[in-house]
């Protein structure tokens, strides 16, 4: 981050907070509670589909085993384009705002923002209603997944995956296991720490490290201590970079000894990079969900509905979840 890139105190946005070291184990037993907190077009042209998503968020085709996109194409004959277009929510919003704000279409038929950004897009009138009649497999969702508080009718969004934010680290660089958010401020790792530009993730962890409860924040003044600690770490050279989803390369290479990271990303990286670890800090971590929505004016809303229905089939959801290592919203697929 350059000096001109000041820490964004208005960006506490992506996650919900998960307190306590027992939360990681408990989370798999309380998935409905996690996911419930998260809560068109002309309908024609169902011969093609364009989905923009986050990196490391779908299973690819490997050898004779078809990935989700190729299975969908084979099952439906719909031509599908899938791209990894996100690095962080604010960056993606800045990308789509000029067109949607001018009443113009953007290219993708489906996007997968985190729930807070989806709520913002809905409030701005930039989303199409879903044709739920064409998504009968939505009945397979974990109870409470439809009708989140920001989409009370449940007509504009459906869940993609959920996960956790904690500390990712490269044990070959740290030389020890990490347990606390305070480890990010250890002088031994000066210049080798990564922080997420998603400030709710980063500041949430630091607040819990300071003994504060982020869920009770009423104003940014309540988080001032955490921002001050982060800004001091930046000015002291403790922080190497503020990143979005691209933290993974620096983590694997050892440019980062440790960073704020997302659970499924790290679990995937471990397949080829066993030196990479993930831990929910003893002070607490955060939990979140990303959702599928259809941007205003999308051409292929029927194909979008067909995709959503496909990924909510339990067999399809299981294969997807087994690869991405995030929490599936489909009942029985955890």
Describe the role of every protein-language-model region.
Residues 119, 194-198, 202, 206, ...:
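Ligand-binding pocket segment of bilobal, Venus flytrap-like solute-binding proteins
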Residues 36-37:
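C-terminal motif of bacterial Sec signal peptides marking the signal peptidase cleavage site
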């Amino acid at each position: 981050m350059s000096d001109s890139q000041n820490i964004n105190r208005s960006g506490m946005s992506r996650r919900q907070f998960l307190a306590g070291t027992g939360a990681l184990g408990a989370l798999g037993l309380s998935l409905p509670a996690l996911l419930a907190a998260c809560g068109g077009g002309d309908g024609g042209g169902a011969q093609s589909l364009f989905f923009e998503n986050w990196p490391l968020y779908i299973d690819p085709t490997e050898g004779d085993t078809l990935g989700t996109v190729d299975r969908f194409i084979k099952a439906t004959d719909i031509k599908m384009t899938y791209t990894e277009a996100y690095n962080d929510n604010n960056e993606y919003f800045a990308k789509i705002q000029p067109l949607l704000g001018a009443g113009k279409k953007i290219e993708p038929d489906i996007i997968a923002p985190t729930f807070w950004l989806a709520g913002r897009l809905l409030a701005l009138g930039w989303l199409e209603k879903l044709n739920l009649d064409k998504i009968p497999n939505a009945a397979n969702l974990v109870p409470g997944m439809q009708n989140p508080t920001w989409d009370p009718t449940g007509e504009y969004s459906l869940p993609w995956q959920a996960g956790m934010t904690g500390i990712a680290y490269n044990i070959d660089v740290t030389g020890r296991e990490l347990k606390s958010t305070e480890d990010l401020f250890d002088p031994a790792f000066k210049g080798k720490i990564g922080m997420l530009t998603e400030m709710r993730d980063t500041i949430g962890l630091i607040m819990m490290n300071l003994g504060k409860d982020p869920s009770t924040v009423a104003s940014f003044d309540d988080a001032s201590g955490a921002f001050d600690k982060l800004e001091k770490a930046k000015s002291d050279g403790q922080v190497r970079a503020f990143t979005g989803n691209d933290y993974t390369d620096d983590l694997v290479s050892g440019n980062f000894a440790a960073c704020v990271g997302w659970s499924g990303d790290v679990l995937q990286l471990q397949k080829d990079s066993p030196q990479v670890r993930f831990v929910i800090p003893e002070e607490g971590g955060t939990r979140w969900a990303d959702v599928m929505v259809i941007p205003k004016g999308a051409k292929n809303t029927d194909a979008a509905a067909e995709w959503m229905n496909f990924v909510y089939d339990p067999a399809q959801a299981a294969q997807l979840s087994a690869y991405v290592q995030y929490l599936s919203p489909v009942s029985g697929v955890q």
